[in-house]
Amino acid sequence: MYIPVKKLAFMATLIAIALAIFTIEAQIPVPIPIPGVKLGLANAVTLFALFFKSGKERDVEKLTVANVFMILICRIVLGAMFTGRVVSFMYSIAGGILGFSAQVLMKQFVSHKQIWAVGAVGAIFHNIGQIAVAIFLTGAPVIAVYLPILIIVGIFTGIITGLAAQFSIKRLEEIS
């Protein structure tokens, strides 16, 4: 698959930003004592990539869903390697793919003023994917008891990441 150099450089920049955010966030202790809870701020970069209207007018070709998916997968794989949390890779990849799929589907029905909602839905499905992996790996369906708590926290954190992406896009469009 051929990717033009400018587009590839833009994707690499987004991966680097997401990795930096992910790595910094991994070092910050979470104030909520619930296993699996974190802000997931690196997802703001995924949302940004999914919604940003790059294009010929900005001298970068528009990112396709496949391009954004590549950014997500690179961030998850490299993030697991950089932080040394390889065990969490399976949780992240399952949650990331499920959350991304939900975000791609929802993108068709929202405007740029509702990216926060896409962030919330993505976080919910991310948590569902992680719980499914936990149940599969442990054989303990009782783990699903965490799901309502993770969904509530996920809505909150998803709104935050969605708003971060939404405001970033708005600001970049204003200065372009």
Give names to the regions the model predicted.
Residues 22-39, 66-104, 137-142:
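Interfacial aromatic-anchored transmembrane helix boundaries in multi-pass membrane proteins
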Residues 53, 62-65, 69, 77, ...:
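A short hydrophobic/aromatic micro-motif that marks alpha-helical segments and, especially, helix-coil
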Residues 35, 85, 89-90, 108-176:
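Membrane-embedded alpha-helical hairpins and interfacial helices in multi-pass inner-membrane proteins
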Residues 4-7, 55-65, 85, 111-116, ...:
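Membrane-helix interface segments
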Residues 9, 13, 62, 67, ...:
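Short helix-perturbing small/polar motifs within transmembrane alpha-helices
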Residues 1-51:
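Hydrophobic transmembrane alpha-helices
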Residues 39-64, 102-106:
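Generic transmembrane alpha-helix motif of multi-pass integral membrane proteins
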Residues 15-23, 76, 80, 96, ...:
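Transmembrane alpha-helical segments of multi-pass membrane transport proteins and ion-pumping complexes
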